[in-house]
Amino acid sequence: MYAMTFAVPPAFRRLTALASAVVFLGIAAAPAAAAESPADWMYSPRTISEIDLTLPPSSWKTLEEHPEDEYVPGTFAIAETDGTPGTAGPFTAPIEVGVRLKGGEFGSLRTLDQKAAFKIKFDAFVEGQTFLGLKKLTLNNMVEDPSMVHEVAAYEAFQALGVPSPHTGFAFLRVNGESFGLHLNIETLDKIALEKRFGPFLSPPQHLYEGEYGADVTPGKSDELEVDEGKKKAGEKGDLEALVAAVANPTPSFSAAVGPVADLDEMTRMWAVEKYSGQWDGYSGQTGEKQPNNYYLYSDPSGRFQMLPWGTDETWGKPIEFEALGGVLFNGCLGDTSCKATYRQALAGALATLNGLDLDDSVRCASERLRPWQDLEAAEKSPAHPERVPFSAGQIASAVASTRDFIADRPAELASFLGVAPPAPPPSQPCPPPTQRRDHEAPPAPGGSTAPSTISASAPPGSIAPPRLIRSRVGERAVHLRVAVSGAGELVLYGWIGAGKKHANACAPARRRASASASTEITCKLTDPALRRRAKHRLRLHLKLDFLPSSGTPQEIRSNLTLSRHRG
């Protein structure tokens, strides 16, 4: 028979935006559409939070001497605002984090005397710690973009075309009480972000490769693709090897060879947005001489790749030709009749979708929301560190105007390339208000290494208490959970199995209505009992239990489930 033991992991997190309670190790087996997450409130262009970092002298010195080499200890706290300075709510309790500077040597890297960009790692020094389910925060300094809205508009365009891409918000940053000004709080592309969009990350064969300057899917250049998620050793990157081989030998055609290992429909949509937005510093290039840069390659469980954008601060500046050569995948597509037709369809889709999206209003409204914070940045400018405010109000206004001119002209330029009539611009709309602080007093506290296995009654007013696992039982064909909830709603149970290096779906999603009047049993029917039997001595079973309440703010808990086989 199987005995069940629970190893409580370091972090238990409260959830405030997702109607979910996760029991056991694992992330949502979600469809391709991004699932909600407790950190979603941070990642809206209408959200402006305030972040306080504290660095001891030793950490400050290390960042001055070795800015990108390592994470140094610091503390982190964040507060929501109503979108304008002076409206911040209570800050979260400070937590220990790792901090390093961010940026490339020839790009946005700045020192602490300047407007530095930062990476914050929540589990750098506290094992298993997360904040709102996140392991990292990425704070871009926007020093390459005086308008401070290029990235927001670019990712909005990618998302409108169905290209998986990071969400963004803004944060006003202070370090040791000194102003570092407005930063773009951009969603870090890591396993957590991928699982929101694509479901459980099973490695191998899944990977996330980062494509920095010059890296491409050709022999000699594919080694420059950095493995950000997934197995890194030689022989464990078969997905990338298959893609490189297909590109090198496109027989009988590029589409026929590359299509099985690359989602060319998705990639052509990404390239269409790159060209539309003038992203000369991306994958598809501008002249044929520009090296690929600022992209990710994500391989799904079958080893098929999608391409994800990154580093879009150089968009909306100058138009680039729609068929200017770039990376080898883009070039190969243009040389293939079928793929080129797909790309032109993607361009036509970009013309219709992005014109209707009214990016001009998005840019105008974002710049209006940021203006009071830019004024605050200027007001808090330190005479000792003037470079922490790199742009004047006039430079910002000029950059915003140039961005809007680009957006206004681009539909006609693309229509001319496609040989169609230019679309009429959409009517201007009033700007929506900034995101307001939520009803409770502050964002929820992060997970910590000493939290109990259930959340205490310190939840915000009006929230739903976390579902409570009463008991669990493993049968020959199913896992049975009995759960108590504090309100009416629906339970949804997903599961998958990891046995050594083998992974498989454990069960089909199960749904049950639940209420506070009685506990509810929900069953995960195993789809592969043979894999379970092959485990012999132990088995790791990952279950995700969502609780979708009729009302209120739900919570989240996590733990590990280990099954051990005993005789007797």
For each of these PLM feature ranges, what is it?
Residues 2-19:
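Bacterial N-terminal signal peptides that target proteins for export
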Residues 16-28:
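Bacterial N-terminal signal peptides
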Residues 34-35, 405, 416-417, 422-568:
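Polybasic, low-complexity, intrinsically disordered segments
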Residues 35-148, 152-156, 214:
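Conserved NTP-binding catalytic cores of kinases and kinase-like/nucleotidyltransferase enzymes
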Residues 40-41, 46-50, 59, 234-451:
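Middle-to-C-terminal accessory/interaction subdomains
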Residues 52, 97-98, 116-121, 136-141, ...:
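Structural recognition of the beta-strand scaffold that forms the well-ordered cores
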Residues 63-66, 108-110, 131-133, 150-151, ...:
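Short, solvent-exposed loop/turn and secondary-structure capping segments
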Residues 117-127, 134, 138-143, 161-166, ...:
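Internal "kinase-insert"/substrate-recognition segments embedded within catalytic cores
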